[in-house]
Amino acid sequence: MSGPLSPVCSCPQLPFMLSPCHMHHHPGHVALSQTVSPASLLTQGLGLPQH
């Protein structure tokens, strides 16, 4: 899942996971955005299994 885009999109640090940009690139994170930590977001952004 590598690409020209950064692992965590190009949105601001927080609340980047609530922005339309992040929802577009990482729709799976929207449901987790209220429970995950920044460190977890980075791991998920890299495409590593977190669940």
UniProtKB/Swiss-Prot annotation:
Highly expressed in pancreas, heart and liver followed by brain, placenta, lung, skeletal muscle and kidney. Mostly expressed in females. This is Putative inactivation escape 1 protein.
